[in-house]
Amino acid sequence: MLWRRAALAGTRLVWSRSGSAGWLDRAAGAAATAASGMESNTSSSLENLETAPVNQIQETISDNCVVIFSKTSCSYCTMAKKLFRDMNVNYKVVELDLLEYGNQFQDALYKMTGGRTVPRIFVNGTFIGGATDTHRLHKEGKLLPLVHQCYLKKSKRKEFQ
């Protein structure tokens, strides 16, 4: 398990245009540093290995207005993705069961949200719940305003760049 964490720490989750996920080396320098023994503290190295999935999740959430952490065989996940498709809202999906390190991501999501079930849905950087919670927000008329709020923020950021 430790070798998996070490491999995870040196990589970054990326998505292709087709929507598939894969791992990309974060930096060759990280591997060189570890190989040369320049790690100053074993406990801080282990701490970094523990936080790598959390950091990658947070980066994904901050880069996208809607993120659905899902599993391909989950009917609730399918229901949540359909809701956003029907609303004509772009979303980023991370299929945990297709990732080599999906269990570590699910553990990190548990630490962040208090639950291991999927889907885990984030809108505008905030965890809103699972499929049932998302449908409830939609029926109450609160979901679309959250999504629009995010798109407005992102468009304003682009104006000032």
From Swiss-Prot:
Modified residues (Phosphoserine): S20
GO MF assignments: 2 iron, 2 sulfur cluster binding; metal ion binding; protein-disulfide reductase activity
Gene3D superfamilies cross-referenced by the UniProt entry: Glutaredoxin
Family classification: Belongs to the glutaredoxin family.
InterPro entries registered for this protein in UniProt: Glutaredoxin, Glutaredoxin_euk/vir, Glutaredoxin_subgr, Thioredoxin-like_sf
Assembly mode: Monomer; active form. Homodimer; inactive form. The homodimer is probably linked by 1 2Fe-2S cluster.
Record carries keyword Transmembrane helix: no
PROSITE patterns: GLUTAREDOXIN_2
One Gene Ontology cellular component annotation held by this UniProt entry: mitochondrion
Activity regulation summary: The 2Fe-2S present in the homodimer leads to inactivation of the enzyme. The 2Fe-2S may serve as a redox sensor: the presence of one-electron oxidants or reductants leading to the loss of the 2Fe-2S cluster, subsequent monomerization and activation of the enzyme.
S-glutathionyl cysteine PTM positions: C74
Organism: Pongo abelii (Sumatran orangutan)
Name listed for the protein in its UniProt record: Glutaredoxin-2, mitochondrial
Domain Glutaredoxin: start-end pairs: 54-154
Family matches, as SUPFAM superfamilies: Thioredoxin-like
Range annotated as the organelle transit peptide: 1-19
Keywords of this entry: 2Fe-2S, Disulfide bond, Electron transport, Glutathionylation, Iron, Iron-sulfur, Metal-binding, Mitochondrion, Phosphoprotein, Redox-active center, Transit peptide, Transport
Location relative to the cell: Mitochondrion
Sequence positions that bind glutathione: K71, Q106, V118
Taxonomy, superkingdom: Eukaryota
Function: Glutathione-dependent oxidoreductase that facilitates the maintenance of mitochondrial redox homeostasis upon induction of apoptosis by oxidative stress. Involved in response to hydrogen peroxide and regulation of apoptosis caused by oxidative stress. Acts as a very efficient catalyst of monothiol reactions because of its high affinity for protein glutathione-mixed disulfides. Can receive electrons not only from glutathione (GSH), but also from thioredoxin reductase supporting both monothiol and dithiol reactions.
SS bond partners: C74-C77
Residues reported to bind [2Fe-2S] cluster: C65, C150
